[in-house]
């Protein structure tokens, strides 16, 4: 059956919402791995439509383990696939955002196309990444941030992980990932790896009714807010999108080069983030401030992006991000001890 859909998209046909749901279910339920890889490659080459993405998201969310949070929360996430091997900026920014008082429910996974995914660097920082919904809620309430490891909350995707990793190129799942937060966070910062995807995802985000506000952006070839150069994005709320162009230097940031944002493996990236949290200035600290400032603004705790950046900068300077990280590590250790005593 998947072969039928593969032939259809090879002929440049577009799938309906229901067909996109069906093809996703086929991929999750034992289709031939070679056909799945071919389908994903052809779909990426042909280009996805907003309707196809929305249908695939629907199929995946129906099979997910959902998390009901009794308060609004925010996620900072990127599509990945920019192949730049930068430090885990969105993960570090999530910790700084939590230090700024924003409840963070971060959804992520291990690396697919980079050296270190969000789950990898969090483990290297000493965080327990596998938490039940109940443990996650306690973590956010006590620490201000929690992490939902994709294989735990989207177990159906485990079957596709080896295929995606074996492809060694970005696929449609890079677009789907940021839209699959199990907590259905009302607020999101979503970075995308190129401008065509920015336009596509802005149309997809308009179809989601559960979100209050989303900031979707692309910056100088990366799925991160950095000071490399101009950032373009969309502020999406109440069924409308507003295009925004941002010059980081207008907020007091110095321009940087891509080499200043480079990371390594998960241990190296954990070390780099800790240095930034401990007061080391530079391009990485600026990127964390930029992203967290946007989070403060989008969440409504600042009236402008400039004010949000000022709050994030002051919070980082005062060492609050490092304190949140230490608190998160302590929570993780206590959780492991609690589990051990129950066995």
Curated annotation (Swiss-Prot):
Q: What is its EC number?
A: 2.4.2.18
| SS bond partners | none
InterPro entries from the entry? Anthranilate_Pribosyl_Tfrase, Glycosyl_Trfase_fam3, Glycosyl_Trfase_fam3_N_dom, Glycosyl_Trfase_fam3_N_dom_sf, Nuc_phospho_transferase
Give the first-level EC class, as a single word.
Answer: transferase
Q: Which controlled-vocabulary keywords does the entry list?
A: Amino-acid biosynthesis, Aromatic amino acid biosynthesis, Glycosyltransferase, Magnesium, Metal-binding, Transferase, Tryptophan biosynthesis
As cofactor, the record names: Mg(2+)
Q: Hey, which pathway is this one from?
A: Amino-acid biosynthesis; L-tryptophan biosynthesis; L-tryptophan from chorismate: step 2/5
The UniProt entry, under Pfam families, shows: Glycos_trans_3N, Glycos_transf_3
Where do the annotations place 5-phospho-alpha-D-ribose 1-diphosphate binding? 78, 81-82, 86, 88-91, 106-114, 118
Is Magnesium included in the keywords of this UniProt record?
yes
Which residues hold Mg(2+) 2?
Answer: 223-224
Binding site residues for Mg(2+) 1:
90, 224
Whether Transmembrane helix counts among this entry's keywords is no
| Function recorded in the entry | Catalyzes the transfer of the phosphoribosyl group of 5-phosphorylribose-1-pyrophosphate (PRPP) to anthranilate to yield N-(5'-phosphoribosyl)-anthranilate (PRA).
Q: How does it assemble?
A: Homodimer.
Protein name per the record: Anthranilate phosphoribosyltransferase
- The species is Chlamydia felis (strain Fe/C-56) (Chlamydophila felis)
